[in-house]
Swiss-Prot record:
InterPro entries tied to this protein: FluC
Membrane topology qualifier: Multi-pass membrane protein
UniProt keyword annotation of Membrane present: yes
GO cellular component: plasma membrane
Organism name: Neisseria meningitidis serogroup C / serotype 2a (strain ATCC 700532 / DSM 15464 / FAM18)
Designated name of the protein: Fluoride-specific ion channel FluC
Organism lineage string: Bacteria, Pseudomonadati, Pseudomonadota, Betaproteobacteria, Neisseriales
Length: 119
């Protein structure tokens, strides 16, 4: 059990830190939602690559469940979308939904293709 908790915890700490740093790196002129969008897109691409290339269970726990689970954020995406709707910005909310969903699906597919190519 502990042999699973350690890589999971390390990955989660690194993923949460990466998401926080990514949000700090987004210029103030851009939407606050942009940092989470980049995090979700990065995670979508990486999960495709990792799913194709990582076979060891401990590395899957560290990188996929821990790191990518903490890097990507459905709760942040949900809050951003609802906040846009509450701010009477339905077009921005729809754009946010489309960009997160379509972009993440496309990048996961691309990641799977990249992972299969380098395997």
């Amino acid at each position: 059990m502990l042999s699973n908790i350690i890589p999971l915890s390390i990955g989660a700490a690194l993923g949460a830190t990466a998401r926080w740093l990514l949000n700090l790196a987004v210029p103030a002129a851009m939407s606050p939602a942009t940092g989470n969008l980049f995090a979700n897109w990065t995670g979508a691409l990486l999960i495709g690559i990792f799913a194709e290339t990582i076979n060891h269970p401990q590395w899957k726990l560290l990188l996929i469940t821990g790191f990518l689970g903490s890097l990507t954020t459905l709760s942040g995406f949900s809050l951003e979308t609802v906040t846009l709707l509450q701010s009477n910005r339905p077009a921005s909310a729809l754009a946010n939904i489309f960009l997160h969903t379509a972009g993440s699906l496309l990048l996961t597919w691309l990641g799977l293709k990249i992972g299969a190519a380098v395997k």
